[in-house]
From Swiss-Prot:
GO terms assigned for molecular function: glycerol-3-phosphate dehydrogenase [NAD(P)+] activity; NAD binding
Name of the protein this chain belongs to: Glycerol-3-phosphate dehydrogenase [NAD(P)+]
Lineage of the organism: Bacteria, Pseudomonadati, Pseudomonadota, Alphaproteobacteria, Hyphomicrobiales
InterPro entries with a match to the protein in the record: 6-PGluconate_DH-like_C_sf, 6PGD_dom2, G3P_DH_NAD-dep, G3P_DH_NAD-dep_C, G3P_DH_NAD-dep_N, NAD(P)-bd_dom_sf
Catalytic activity: sn-glycerol 3-phosphate + NAD(+) = dihydroxyacetone phosphate + NADH + H(+); sn-glycerol 3-phosphate + NADP(+) = dihydroxyacetone phosphate + NADPH + H(+)
Entry annotation: catalytic residues: 192
Species, as recorded: Parvibaculum lavamentivorans (strain DS-1 / DSM 13023 / NCIMB 13966)
Length: 333
């Protein structure tokens, strides 16, 4: 293993994992893409396409898919793109084969629902010998895979590793900015998914652009309060993985979390929306965990709490909205 990170394994062949494999291949790396589905492995290796999760985009012929986690573990660095709620199980399978100090880059955005742990904390329990890193920022998989310009944050406590990873996967159209603030980079992505559901509800209810702007801004205040309480840096929360990701996710129906919120605002049930999808909306699973973190740190997050009540069935959309709008007037800061 060297800091050149010549061989990259992408663990998880959904849309985002496939897009990151495309980026790493474009950067000249040897890329192994792990998928659960045998038919998807065959699809990538023979047709050079991910017809299931990223159809219509031609993949680099150098990307090699595998269903063998042990093979993926042999890479110089691992990009973990499995859904947040399944991350622990995959990491535990990989752990015996992860060498001391090998970078494991967490690319999913969420908080473990059952434990309320950040994914870096999950990694510390499952594979403590790994060098934890986080990749997060305003990015849609299809745009990244097509080579449209995108910038993200890549954080690792060892900034030398973060910089080396940036050079390993960075290309002209995919620009990672490195940082040593793991908590800030990770928390922004997890919380914005919850807030995006709220913004989608605003859109679905046709409350207007002013209401969505207000909710996005007040939501960012919630994210910032929690982030600072947990040790994140202000500049990280104001950066790509925080404010940047929030702006994108709360303003585009292409966001899975915002589109889910829109459907809820239009009157659909959560079961109806989730049943019609083959992709994951992490905000649904992270909402209760984010609220638990806020309570643990004594932070008020009324928007996140409203989303948590909606997705758990504790409140109807209209009742949760009414409760937010009837909160007492207060100072902005």
């Amino acid at each position: 293993m060297t800091l050149a990170y010549r061989k990259i394994a992408v663990v998880g062949a959904g849309a985002w994992g496939t897009a990151l494999a495309q980026v790493a291949a474009s950067a000249g790396r040897e890329v192994v893409l792990w998928a659960r589905e045998d038919e998807l492995v065959q699809n990538v290796n023979t047709a050079h396409e991910n017809s299931l999760f990223l159809p219509g985009i031609a993949l680099h012929k150098s990307i090699r898919a595998t269903g063998d986690l042990a093979e993926a573990a042999e890479a110089d660095a691992l990009l973990m793109v499995t859904p947040a709620q399944h991350m622990r199980g995959v990491l535990e399978q990989l752990a015996p084969r992860i060498a001391e100090g090998k970078p494991v880059v967490l690319c999913a955005k969420g908080v473990e629902q059952s434990t309320h742990l950040l994914l870096t904390e999950v990694l510390a329990e499952a594979a403590p010998q790994a060098a934890a890193a986080v990749l997060s920022g305003p990015s849609f998989a299809a745009e990244v895979a097509r080579g449209l310009p995108t910038a993200v944050t890549l954080a690792c406590e060892d900034e030398t590793v973060a910089e080396a990873l940036t050079h390993a996967i960075g290309i002209t159209t995919f620009r990672p900015y490195y940082s040593s603030d793991l908590i800030g980079a990770e928390l922004g992505g997890a919380v914005k998914n919850v807030l995006a559901i709220a913004c989608g509800i605003v859109e679905g209810k046709k409350f207007g652009d002013s209401a969505r702007a207000a909710l996005t801004t007040r939501g960012f205040a919630e994210l910032t309060r929690l982030g600072l309480a947990m040790g994140a840096r202000t500049e990280t929360l104001m950066g790509l993985s925080g404010l940047g990701d929030l702006i994108l996710t709360c303003n585009s129906p292409k966001s899975r979390n915002m589109s889910l919120g829109m459907a809820l605002g239009e009157g659909k049930t959560l079961e109806e929306v989730m049943g019609a999808r083959n992709s994951v909306s992490e905000g649904v699973h992270s909402a209760t965990a984010v609220v638990a973190l806020a309570r643990k740190h004594g932070i008020e997050m009324p928007i996140a709490e409203a989303v948590a009540r909606i997705v758990t069935g504790a409140a109807k959309v209209d009742d949760a909205v009414a409760a937010l709008l009837s909160r007492p007037f207060r100072s902005e800061t």
